[in-house]
From Swiss-Prot:
SUPFAM superfamilies, sorted: MFS general substrate transporter
Keyword terms, alphabetized: Cell inner membrane, Cell membrane, Glycerol metabolism, Membrane, Transmembrane, Transmembrane helix, Transport
Secretion signal span: none
Biological function: Responsible for glycerol-3-phosphate uptake.
Positions on the Cytoplasmic side per record topology: 1-36, 86-94, 143-161, 220-274, 322-334, 397-415, 464-479
Entry's Gene Ontology molecular function annotations: glucose 6-phosphate:phosphate antiporter activity; glycerol-3-phosphate transmembrane transporter activity
Periplasmic side: 58-64, 114-121, 182-201, 296-300, 355-359, 438-442
Organism: Haemophilus influenzae (strain ATCC 51907 / DSM 11121 / KW20 / Rd)
Family: Belongs to the major facilitator superfamily. Organophosphate:Pi antiporter (OPA) (TC 2.A.1.4) family.
Listed name of the protein: Glycerol-3-phosphate transporter
Lineage: Bacteria, Pseudomonadati, Pseudomonadota, Gammaproteobacteria, Pasteurellales
Amino acid sequence: MFGPFKPAPHIAELPAEKIDSTYKRLRWQVFAGIFFGYAAYYFVRANFDLAQPGLIQAGLYSKAELGVIGSAAGLAYGLSKFVMAGMSDRSNPRVFLPFGLLLSGLCMTLMGLFPWATSGIAIMWVMIFLNGWFQGMGWPPCGRTMVHWWSKSERGTIVSIWNTAHNIGGMVPGAMVLLASAIFFSTHGIEAQAKDVWQQSLYFPGIAAMIFAIPVYFVMRDTPQSCGLPSIEKWRNDYPDDYNEKTYENDLTAKEIFVTYVLKNKLLWYIAIANVFVYLIRYGVLKWSPVYLSEVKHFNIKGTAWAYTIYELAAVPGTLLCGWVSDKVFKGKRGLTGFIFMILTTAAVVAYWMNPATPEAELANYSAWYENPYQLTDFVLMTLIGFLIYGPVMLIGLHALELAPKKAAGTAAGFTGLFGYLGGTVSASAVIGWAAQHYGWDGGFYVMIGGGVLAVLLLLIVMVEEGKHKAKLGDTYGTK
């Protein structure tokens, strides 16, 4: 890379008496940077989904049209995450991470404040594509940072904690819609409908994301060696089974990264394909629940915003539990943990689909969703799905990081993301939108449930192959 994006050079090691204290302080500091930085990316990752009911209600776009527009996000993000991962592996995350955040926030701010940016399908598709491309600059530098600052035996826990950042950030758009609704009520004296606040759901999070980019730059650092510290493996005396100082600590060529450590890695291919169907459910529920709950389950804008928010909130304890289980109970067996969580996730999606809508004759009996037993059940099931689905999402990214040397970790994770977003997110938007438009919401749920079953089968294969892989290397997880 060049200019400010160039990796920070290694410097002379600090005196021995300063290493421990400096390492501990900088790990907290760097973690704050990647946690709050990545959380801010999620201010503007899926906030467009909350604008969709308003765009439909205002008669501006149909579900099928929004599905086409929304597909740009997955297409762009999948390509970008892979391309940017290769660039990130040879860049300074201190610059790379906040720069992408700034550009992504700018895209959403333009869409919310300037009518030309939402004036037609083509221009909206381009704007969503650009936002998705800049979003691809978020995960790779964070993954690169974690493999340099935390060793293998602690990585499952630290990645699961960090992974909750996107759930924390994902709650912000819903909260901002509630804020916009409150402002509308205070100025107009009537309850806001979806068509009244869709612009705010775009530019409120966009402005917030741009503001967050500034402190992220100041707290981030590149590698430990660029701060005068030894490698994390040396400091913790915790080496992977296949550790080789040349490949782990020295920069690799683009060909070595892509061909040797990605394309020839069979286990990485398995988890990449599984990621397609994990992401299909993750984004199928997230993207279409605001419309589904509004059209079918009779939720108002406040109920929809609360359900969207709790879906992300529930992911925090679910992801932490999944990371802890994979580390402490299953001793690093990511495939087994993901297999169990995806079985439970698919069952929860079936229950969400089967729960009946409130009979229209009874709607007047309930003043809020939490007083309505039908809607309360939907709310609980949304919570359960959010609790379960983000564990496999986290595990696949973590597994990819562990299947390649540190200098190729971002590309390995980008490879799985490429499949997840090109296959899973595009399908969650375009295919589910098309199915719901032409076959009703049952058609949309057939797609999601079928994806859940395929994810379970693929993670079963991963589980079996993972066992063979560990047996071949000698399972010394967490013993060094």
